[in-house]
Amino acid sequence: DASGVAAKGATPSFYKNYDAIPSRGGMSALTMAGAVAGWSEALKISKEWQGGKEGLPLTTLLDTAISQANWGIEVTQSLTDASNKTFDDLAGDENFDQFLIKGKALKKGKILKLTALSKTLAHLAEKGLDDFYHGELAQNLAADLEAAGSPIRLEDFENYKAQRVPPLHVTTSK
């Protein structure tokens, strides 16, 4: 289970001046990202299943994603719709600008370059996945989130762990 958990600081007192948790912006970022820890745990499980043998190097596993993020992705209709829906709320937010093309809402068929994602993945390929939670990347992300108004702090990064849990199963027919 690599789902996000609420930041330690995401308390009622943190949001005391609000009727509800904001739906946009830094204060809405209140759950710790777990995907990278999930990748790390999956690699450990893979190694166990292979009798302790190492699988593909992390650089190889992330290379295509790094290249694709750097080259860019074609904007789909659903991404266009999401961009139009959030544009007025987030326009002018310096953190949102990286998800725009020349300061405008996304248009279907255009290419959106994800340079920051490419750099982050390249950093993880070089330093290892644990850097996301315990290294330079964790420190930078925590500082950026705090500056944006998020309750997530470095402590939340450092304390996050993916968990191995039994898979959910149900009987669908008899």
How would you name each of these model-derived features?
Residues 1-128, 132-134, 138-173:
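Noncatalytic scaffold domains of N-terminal-nucleophile
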